[in-house]
Amino acid sequence: MSITFEVTGYCPCTKCCGKSDGITASGTKAKANHTIAAPKTYAFGTKIQLEGYGTFVVEDRGGAIKGNRIDRFFDTHQEALNWGRKKINGKVV
């Protein structure tokens, strides 16, 4: 089943996370092109394939992450800003 996600970006800086250690809510070290923050409706470890971008793993949460909104992790703040906000079709795999 295809889901349209609203995907924003974040990084390990204090502006994005309030801390800068890069440790996710699940206790893992966040990795670019791997980690996403998703609502609690998606258990930690859930894999979500984003059309055209690959498969990511739910390892984090976020205060504004609700419904079909997810946050893709980037190594730098500039990369997260450059990503912006995108609507992307995806599915749980």
Locate the predicted segments by residue.
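Solvent-exposed, well-ordered loop and adjacent helix/strand elements within mature globular domains
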Residues: M1-V93
